[in-house]
């Protein structure tokens, strides 16, 4: 491989919305926030979970709510 052309591969912190914190290796170079992880994802836990989409729904209703009313 050529020297000094590849991005740095370093350890970062990935924090999930459930509070789970993981140390992973990435070329991103900064800490990341996750919506779901293996500790809270329904596939792994076997439980159903509601995802918070209130902001998007409210924005949609605000834009197009008047069109549905006659």
UniProtKB/Swiss-Prot annotation:
Binds 1 zinc ion per subunit. GO terms for molecular function: metal ion binding; rRNA binding; structural constituent of ribosome. The keyword Methyltransferase does not apply. Binds the 23S rRNA. Zn(2+) binds at residues 16, 18, 37, 40. The keyword RNA-binding applies. Part of the 50S ribosomal subunit. Pfam families: Ribosomal_L31. HAMAP family: Ribosomal_bL31_1. This is Large ribosomal subunit protein bL31. PROSITE patterns: RIBOSOMAL_L31. It comes from the Bacteria. NCBIfam families: L31, PRK00019.1, PRK00528.1. Belongs to the bacterial ribosomal protein bL31 family. Type A subfamily. Keywords: Metal-binding, Ribonucleoprotein, Ribosomal protein, RNA-binding, rRNA-binding, Zinc. Gene3D superfamilies: Ribosomal protein L31.
